[in-house]
UniProtKB/Swiss-Prot annotation:
It is a multi-pass membrane protein. It comes from the Bacteria. Induction: Transcriptionally regulated by guanidine, via a guanidine-sensing riboswitch. Keywords: Cell membrane, Ion transport, Membrane, Transmembrane, Transmembrane helix, Transport. The efflux pump is composed of GdnC and GdnD. InterPro entries: Small_drug/metabolite_transptr, Small_multidrug_res. One of its GO terms (biological process) is transmembrane transport. It comes from Bacillus subtilis (strain 168). This is Probable guanidinium efflux system subunit GdnC. GO terms for molecular function: transmembrane transporter activity.
Length: 112
């Protein structure tokens, strides 16, 4: 559940980052602002029970990979094998950080 908040925050990050580039009306700028608000709200909630450094690294890694992949799929950004390879390396690092990180309730041996 706690890591789910980080993943959901990263999804909203992808939305607002793409919005920064493509927003061109009050409606799309409003959507971008809403994405920023939800993204940071979920990020802050996740840091209440997970280490902030790891949460931020996972958040930015997922957001970066998601943004690049979204630009490729939705906006036909050029893609080559080096770009895909580096996204894969980034995701391996994100998964590794998640796997080696315990949340604070696990460290204390209790339920939050």
């Amino acid at each position: 559940m706690k890591w789910g908040l980080v993943v959901l925050a990263a999804v909203f990050e992808v939305v607002w980052v793409i919005g920064l580039k493509h927003a061109d009306s009050a409606l799309t700028w409003s959507g971008t602002a809403i994405g920023i608000i939800f993204s940071f709200y979920l990020l802050m909630k996740a840091t209440h029970s997970l280490p902030v450094g790891t949460v931020y690294a996972v958040f930015t890694g997922l957001g970066t990979a998601g943004t690049v992949l979204s630009e490729i799929v939705l906006f036909h950004e050029p893609v080559g094998w080096p770009k895909l390879l580096l996204i894969g390396v980034l995701l391996i690092g994100v998964i590794g950080l998640k796997l080696v990180t315990q949340d604070e309730t696990e460290e204390k041996g209790g339920e939050a």
